[in-house]
Amino acid sequence: MSSSLTIFFFFFASTFLYTSSNSFNITNILNEHDDFSNFNQLLSETQLASTINKRQTITVLVVSNGALSSLSGQPTSVIKKILSLHIVLDYYDQKKLKNLSKKTVLLTTLFQSSGLARGQQGFLNATVMKNGDVAFGSAVPGSSLDAQLQDTVAALPFNISVLHISSAIMIDVKGDNAPTASPLSPVSSPPRPAESPNDDGQDFDEPPSSAPGAAADEPSENAGSANGVSRNDSQPAFAFTLLMSFIWWFMARLR
């Protein structure tokens, strides 16, 4: 076996091991939390779960079963747009959000990248309130910050962060032309009112050219073990086994 072929194989195996070790599955993550079973089911039904799993860096804002009443009776096309607004195209954990330098940030979501958003519909406003809590709301002018950050569901810096918020963030997407489907079963619990923010400035999270631009805050330095993240553990194990088998075979050929 030539040395160039050996180097190529080791490079390929190392890359595969690195990629596999950072993989995640949002369905498996939420399967560990019964209170998010409805949200988890909707992600699968709208095929957003597979989209999330293909991303290398993502933040998912999840809503408990008792706080999904605002999505009751909505067609699948509307639900998909609303849920995609809860998928942020960057990594944000609690520490990063609570330490925003300007106390507020504009977040780019999957809905914005779909090309279906109108105006500021594809962006979220995250703001640190006077009491230190973090609240979310649509970036559409006149929208309130109704969704409060509750806690962390899972985190794998800097690949995926799953955060529990108090209510779904709603925008008006019913006027869009899209196919409809059967409505959902009703759920209960209205959203909470929001507090007034303590800072009027905005710090933007890399929005496209159509939105006002500014730099986002740097990721928080809390890398380490994933809190509650369910990884695709079989892939790294298989890759490691494959690599070790090749090394054993290669060493045997050298004898």
UniProtKB/Swiss-Prot annotation:
* Residue ranges, compositional bias (Polar residues): 222-231
Residue ranges annotated as propeptide are 226-255
Which residues bear GPI-anchor amidated serine-type lipidation? 225
InterPro entries registered for this protein in UniProt: FAS1_dom_sf, FAS1_domain, Plant_FLA
Task: Give the start-end ranges of region Disordered.
Answer: 179-231
What is the official name of this protein in its record? Fasciclin-like arabinogalactan protein 14
- Per UniProt, the ranges with Acidic residues bias are 197-206
State the protein's purpose: May be a cell surface adhesion protein.
Q: Which residues does the UniProt record annotate as the domain FAS1? A: 24-169
Signal peptide (from-to) = 1-23
Q: Which UniProt keywords apply?
A: Cell membrane, Glycoprotein, GPI-anchor, Lipoprotein, Membrane, Proteoglycan, Signal
| Organism of this sequence | Arabidopsis thaliana
